[in-house]
Amino acid sequence: LQYMFLGVEAIDAEGLKMHRKRISLGRNFEALEFARSLGITVAINLIADPDWDRERFEVVRQWCLDIPEIVNISVNTPYPGTESWVTESRKMHTRDYRLFDIQHAVMPTKMPLHEFYAELVKTQQVLNKKHLGWAALKGTAKIAAGHLMRGQTNFIKMLWKFNSVYNPELQMADHRRPVVYEMSPPPEKKDKVDAKQLYILPAKGRQGRNIDDATET
């Protein structure tokens, strides 16, 4: 085992409780330290909640800069079959299927939406500064040279693609696109969930699907 993706999700106890991790903050960091001691390269995932403000984003950015690991930032997104799908009290402001990709906010944000995306991308820029561009090229020079000798340029181009992919204006534009497929609404909020029913999606036939007979056949 050389690489590990670790779902830390939050760097504070309140965030862990929100994401129902059922683990202490100390235990999370113990797992990270143990992986480091084994020489495993760790990629960390954190979840940005729509309720974050500028100060919260700044705290997370500084933490990401202070550690050597790659940190990925995703957006808190309830999915059918998960616990948060039935316990989340915040109403979704969109059910556009395309936006349920953990890079778009489908629940109301505390900040104006465009400001939330600007802070999100600014935080994700830490990944770009630390691990892409020239920083990545230094560690992959032999690999890059081999690709170039074979006329393959995709790897090199990828190292500088961050700004064309992570762009708050593109995220806002996604919200303005006409909705083609809409997610079925979640059930009424429940305080307690039967764990046996999680991650099990019963067949609902054509319910909630905007597909006609001609398209389906």
Regions found by a protein language model. Give the residues of each.
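Alpha-helix N-cap/helix-start and coil->helix boundary motif
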Residues: 12-13, 113
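Short, glycine-/aromatic-enriched active-site segment of Class I SAM-dependent methyltransferases
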Residues: 16-18
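Radical SAM enzyme core and accessory elements
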Residues: 83-97, 101-217
